Amino acid sequence: MAIVLCITMITIPTFAATEKKPTLMILPSDHWCEQRFYMTTWDNQGVKVKTADYQTAFLQDRELTQVISKLGELLTKQGYSLKDAEQETKAVFNRIAEDNVTMSSTSWSTLAETPLDMIKKRAKMDILVQIDWTINSDRSVTFTLEAFDSYTSKRIATSTGTGKPSNEIVPIMLEQAIKSKIKEFDKQMDTYYADLNQNGREIVLTIKCWANWDGNLEIENEEGDELLDVIQKWLKKNTVNGVFNLSDATETFAQFEQVRIPLYDEEGDALDARGFTTMLRKHLVKECEITSKVMTRGLGEGILVLGEK
């Protein structure tokens, strides 16, 4: 099989000129949902997995909405913009049956995503904030706040504390307890996001080959570069400071971890794993005449399957 492989590079800016606070979305923690029986079973390609049932939690627990609203007010005062967790969750769960898999239009190959992956992908928030709280016997409230990078699921900030005993409603008790801790929580997130601005956002990029494709990652161009070499040279030019790590590679599979991509594209729009992987897809189809399909898991993993759509 004759395939012409070329190495045309595209460069993109490291980050937008004007830095801005990341976008947040607030959800209850898995522990909070478990304690209140807001859990559901998700079918992960035949394996039953328990996951938080956010839709039922929002429908049945009025206190949750009030708590998220109060926490949202505190974070908004720190300069963050918020995604509406209840509306985003409702939209995802209403379409979960049809959106649960992504398929190849010709081979019907599937790629499963968790409900939380789908919420992240739809909402496109930078950081997921999860809250857990417990009412103690003396009418004080103990809380835990955790912030996670929506792309990597890495914990980037945490705060815990106990408020003074109070006869106020729970949302007010939590607001009072969290208020004294919010600046330190904000500082942790700021430090992390400053690193992203400087060094790029971290994603995972996976390259696969359809079983019915007669090519693989070892086919060579006229200069003797294998397809995997071509992809790595493109990554070196298009990642921030050329940072990525080839963690695994075979004839038909390659996985790149710690791939540092710019926060924003040339138009100043937020760049996620799908956008970055699509850039590589366009490069391969234009310069190397290789058709491929882009898939994603959440915001932070791009999967490029070579050989067909």
Task: Report each predicted region and the residues it spans.
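Solvent-exposed coil/turn segments that connect beta secondary-structure elements
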Residues: 29-32, 87-88, 146, 150-151, ...
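N-terminal segment of the mature soluble domain
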Residues: 40-113, 121-122, 225-264, 269-285
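Sec/Tat signal peptide C-region and signal peptidase I cleavage site
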Residues: 12-16
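Extracytoplasmic
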Residues: 19-21, 62, 66, 70, ...
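Amphipathic beta-strand/beta-sheet edge segments enriched in Tyr/Trp
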Residues: 123-168, 299-309
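Bacterial N-terminal signal peptides
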Residues: 1-11
